[in-house]
Amino acid sequence: MHEVRLDTALSMPAGFRFSEVPSHTIASPLALAPSLGPLAAFTGTFRGHGFNTIFRPQNAKTPTTLPELVPASDNILELNLTEETLSFSPGLGSVPNRGEVRGDIALNGVPYLQVINDVTVPGRPVGIHFEPGLWMAVPALDDPVEGATVVRMASIPHGTTVQAQGESFIIAGKPDIPSIDITPFVTAQPDKKIPFPSQTAADGGTPRIPQDLGPFIAAGTITQALLADPASLLRTHIAAQSITTTMVITISTAPAAPLFGGGISNIAFLLGNPATSAPNAQVVKMEATFWIETIEYDIEVPALELGQSLRISPVRTEDGGQLVPEFVTPPLRVNPPRIIKVSAPQIQYAQQVFLNFNGLTWPHVSVATLVPAAPVPVSASAWA
């Protein structure tokens, strides 16, 4: 995997910690930071592989040239095999929010940085996404009445900012990852889908990047099944994994009632000329689900002398080509060699961003599976 060095998402000055500005000059202890809730799992740096699809606008003024000439089209379907690094900084502390109708509340959260490279062409990584942002934990409210929620605040270099709010829950075992359809639809009429020839993997004469998917079909990396349902990649990654628990986080810029709040803001270029109501590529909605899974691995520990420590990869299984974390053993004496069970977090996500142009709404889908970038310490309980 092309290495991306990110120790933290965003570096904060030493000693910086959110809290309430005191109303008296007499020194008082800082308030304890509120719970991060499900966001406590967002610690350190994760990396992994994924897949991205986006229908891009195509125009006569700055057309994209393709290996094989195709009839004029208002769009190009871009497909990306991806490498991703997702890095989290330490929690912010107690972030006060003042209320007029209800009492004040305090939030807590973690800054993050998401960096994605296109690696469709081996040896030629291309940066396609850079997203600094915040994940914030919001306590339960009585005015408005709303349970505890999480919020993702994201800034996208193309000219879009996102506020997506939602809820979380825990399930035992593997998640049930639903299918995702990339087919565009008539704006405001999601049942009126408009499929395009570029969604047919075997058709090499369509406005698509890459245009010829033959080599990828042969390699099993971009297939018709993947175009029909990008989330199938996530299910492949976990098919043979032993997952004990899953924290599920669902967020949206337009969450379903009783939740509300959130939204999207675009720069003028994306909105287009308001007089003609013809956006260039207006982002109108984002929704995503994150599955934070606890994976149980087997690692084979050789004989070790007291004081020795070793970095070990798990015993390989059919993992769908996905990365697995490394583990570092404590300095204990091990004799004879043994296989032990260890656990580590894994983040999977499926995200849909909806763009409006030329009378249609175009789903932009991203999926990935991410594991800890640094070796995971083996806990003492693994030796019991």
Language-model-detected regions and their locations in the chain:
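Soluble ligand-binding/transfer domains with enclosed cavities or grooves
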Residues: 2-384
